[in-house]
Amino acid sequence: MTNGNGTPPEGAPPQLNVLAQYTKDLSFENPNAPASLAPQQQQPAINIQINVGANNVGENEYEVTLSIEGKAESGSSVLFSFELAYAGVFRVLNVPQENLHPLIMIECPRLLFPFAREIIASAVRDGGFPPLMLDPVDFIGLYRQNLERAQQQGQPS
C-alpha cells in the first residue's frame, strides 16, 4: 500500500513476502557403493557446512541462497557426500535500512531451512542410507560469525 507517490505511508508495518523458492543445485554422491551400504560397526562422522548468500534482484527484492554441504565418513572411507543450494526470492518492504541486512541474512534462511532439510533427508534416504535429519541452525550465531570474520579480514559485511 502506498500514499500515491510510490512510497509507503508513514508508520507502515514491515513486510517480508516469499515470492519463490527453488533448488538451484543438488548433488549426492555415494562413491563406494555398494560397499558403503553394508552395516557399519560405528556411527559415521558427519561434517556439515552451511553458508548464506544474498543478491538484490529487483526493487526491494532479494534472492537468498542457503548452501549446505555435507560428508559422512567411516574411518578413511567416504560413505556419502552432498551439496545443496536452495534459494528463495523475498520482497522486503518498510524495513529500516539498518535492519535490512540482518533480516535478509537471518530471517530469510530461517524460512528456507526446513525445505532444504527435507531435500537433504530425502536425497540421503534415496541414496540407500537412513535419512539425515539436520539439527536446527542458529542463523543469528552464523550471521555474527560471518560479521566477525568479515571485520577481521577488513571486508564490508
Curated annotation (Swiss-Prot):
It is found in: Cytoplasm. It comes from the Bacteria. The keyword Coiled coil does not apply. GO terms for biological process: protein folding; protein tetramerization; protein transport. Belongs to the SecB family. One of the proteins required for the normal export of preproteins out of the cell cytoplasm. It is a molecular chaperone that binds to a subset of precursor proteins, maintaining them in a translocation-competent state. It also specifically binds to its receptor SecA. PANTHER family: PROTEIN-EXPORT PROTEIN SECB (PTHR36918:SF1), PTHR36918. This is Protein-export protein SecB. The gene is secB.
